[in-house]
Structures are given as structure tokens and as C-alpha cells.
Amino acid sequence: SEGRSRLLGAPVPVRENDEGLQRALQFAMAEYNKASNDKYSSRVVRIISAKQQLVSGIKYIMEVEIGRTTCPKSSADLQSCEFHDEPEMAKYTTCNFVVYSIPWLNQIKLLKSSCQ
């Protein structure tokens, strides 16, 4: 496993349009919205930083700014949800998410979620 061990290691930056990153972020936001007791859904405003780390799967380490949308929790298509106009309603927050993904086993889990 000489070749494999070289791949493991430090987190490296990942492009915002990376498919795995997008999936990880979507998953993190779904979990965030599930756990929040807000009646509105939140979604990502912008990605501040994103890294991936190859362990026995892929760990995505993300710092994102999220905002509260005008859509209730039940709404399916979050991407088309508008953000609240009033800043105190929009509640922009910076969150750190760590998602662990093993795509070939179809496994994904949120390891860390902390928002300021």
C-alpha cells in the first residue's frame, strides 16, 4: 500500500465547483436545517474556504456563510429560495462543517457543525 499512503495526509484546498464538495455541503446544510428549530430553512450564501483530506474516505472541511431564506423547512428546492431582506431576519452566520464521505460505500456523515 506504498502508493496509497502518499495520498493520505494534510487537507488540501478544493474547488468550489467540485462535485464531492457540493454533495458534502448539501448534506451538511440538510443536517443543519433538520437540527435547527427555526421554521425557515437556511442555505449557503458563500463558501469562505473548502478543503478536502483523504483519509480512508474523503473528509471535507468547509467554512461557509449561511443565511436564512424565506422558505419554510418543508420546502424542497432550497436553491431557489430567496434570502430574507431585513438583516435581522436573514441572520447571516458563519459555520464550520466537517463532512466525512465514503462515496464508493455510499456513506456520508456530518462530523462537525459549529456556527457563530
Curated annotation (Swiss-Prot):
SMART domains, alphabetized: CY
Major subcellular location class: secreted
SUPFAM superfamilies named in the record: Cystatin/monellin (SSF54403)
Leader sequence residues: none
Marked site positions, Reactive site: G9
Sites of Phosphoserine modification: S80
GO cellular component, one term: extracellular space
Classification via Pfam families: Cystatin
Source species, domain of life: Eukaryota
Role, per record: This protein binds tightly to and inhibits papain and cathepsin B.
Name the UniProt record assigns to this protein: Cystatin
Organism: Coturnix japonica
